[in-house]
Structure formats: C-alpha cells, structure tokens
UniProtKB/Swiss-Prot annotation:
UniProt source species: Ligilactobacillus salivarius (strain UCC118) (Lactobacillus salivarius)
Name recorded for this polypeptide: UPF0122 protein LSL_0628
HAMAP family: UPF0122 (MF_00245)
Superkingdom of this protein's organism: Bacteria
Coiled-coil parts of chain: none
Length: 112
C-alpha cells in the first residue's frame, strides 16, 4: 500500500468520518489508522476477508466522492499553504509587529 494513498485516505477520513456508517468507520479506521490486515479485521468481526476488502474499497470511493463534491480536504490544504506563506512573509518583513504575529498564530491554532 503506497504511503501517499494511506495518507490521503486518512486525511479524507478525518474530514468525512461523520458521514460514514459505523461499519465503514470501523473497517477503514482499523485498516488505515491502526494498520490491521484484511484477515485480522475479518477474524475480529467474523466475516470473510473479501467482505472486508469490498467494504474498504467501497468506502474509499465514497470518501473520494465526498471530496470531489465538497473539497474540504483540498481547501484545507490550500488554506494551510497560504497561512504558511503569510507567516513566512510577515516574519521576513514585519518581525517587529508582535500583534500581527500573534494574530497569525491564532489563525494557525484554529487549524488544529
């Protein structure tokens, strides 16, 4: 499993988890966040490995569909990048303005 895909699915899961069913949340969380194998999940929930695989693949598609419609993750990435650029600019050009730096730091803390 490619690390980029794992990171993307985890990020999408962070944004869209409340929109998933309990089973989808459980399987995708165990597989991507907790690094369980398909076999381990299947054994724990007394279902076939194929059933787990199908559920995870279907959930991945659902997460990608949510993102294609809502763009929450993409917008978060763009906002984070712009905030980083702003902070860098302010530190380079307005380092003496402590109030400005404080306000930017407050914005950064809202992302967490």
């Amino acid at each position: 499993m490619a690390i980029e895909k794992t990171n993307r699915i985890n990020a999408l899961f962070d944004f869209y988890e409340p929109l998933l069913t309990p089973k989808q949340m459980t399987y995708i969380g165990l597989y991507y966040r907790d690094d369980y194998s398909l076999g381990e999940i299947a054994e724990n929930y007394e279902v076939s490995r194929q059933a787990v695989y199908d559920n995870i693949r279907r959930t991945e598609k659902i997460l990608e569909e949510y993102e294609s419609k809502l763009h929450l993750y993409r917008n978060f990435q763009l906002q984070s990048e712009e905030l980083d650029n702003l902070l860098k600019y302010v530190e380079e050009n307005y380092a003496y303005d402590k109030e400005l730096l404080t306000r930017i730091n407050r914005l950064e803390s809202l992302e967490e």
